[in-house]
């Protein structure tokens, strides 16, 4: 019997406010609704899905470190840490778990300081501007990548 593949979904600062915060940029769905949809999608594919949202950079880094040897793929919306966190980049590189970077809004159509990501050049893929559906696309891509490895 093969062990289930595990995918970790990480969400950075202020994403706990989804549904309330700037719905024109981020949509009206709450993070809980987005994660529930992802859990259903993962369950149908026989994938174990874990989720963490944190406003604290170190908690996201610790989750990445703890994922080493236990998680097969990471989906991360680093939110504002996208543009500032060399530490998140180093953590992801350190564990060498493939990851997809997700953003609800099109960061390239927003303020110039949002255009740079410390993660994009190391990600397997980047999805931005597709709202909550971007997470579903990322999960589908991660599942396909894991199935291709088997």
Swiss-Prot record:
Alphabetically ordered keywords of this record: Amino-acid biosynthesis, Aromatic amino acid biosynthesis, Lyase
This enzyme's EC code(s): 4.2.1.10
Residues carrying the site annotation Transition state stabilizer: 21
Domain of life the protein comes from: Bacteria
List of catalytic residues: 26, 103
Biological process terms in GO annotation: amino acid biosynthetic process; aromatic amino acid family biosynthetic process; chorismate biosynthetic process; quinate catabolic process
Record-level Gene Ontology MF annotations: 3-dehydroquinate dehydratase activity
Catalytic activity: 3-dehydroquinate = 3-dehydroshikimate + H2O
Stored Gene3D superfamilies: Dehydroquinase, class II
HAMAP family, A to Z: AroQ
Subunit structure: Homododecamer.
Protein name (database record): 3-dehydroquinate dehydratase
């Amino acid at each position: 019997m093969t062990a289930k593949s595990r995918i970790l979904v990480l969400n950075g600062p202020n994403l706990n406010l989804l549904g309330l915060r700037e719905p024109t940029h981020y949509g009206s769905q709450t993070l809980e609704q987005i994660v529930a949809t992802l859990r259903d999608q993962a369950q149908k594919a026989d994938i174990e899905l874990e989720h963490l949202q944190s406003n604290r950079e170190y908690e996201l880094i610790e989750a990445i470190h703890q994922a080493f040897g236990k998680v097969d793929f990471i989906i991360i919306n680093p939110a504002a840490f996208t543009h500032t966190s060399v530490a998140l980049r180093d953590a992801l590189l350190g564990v060498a778990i493939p990851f997809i970077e997700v953003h609800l809004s099109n960061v390239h159509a927003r303020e110039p300081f949002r255009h740079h990501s410390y993660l994009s050049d190391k990600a397997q893929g980047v999805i931005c501007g597709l709202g909550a559906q971007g997470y579903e696309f990322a999960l589908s891509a991660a599942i396909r990548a894991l199935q291709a490895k088997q």
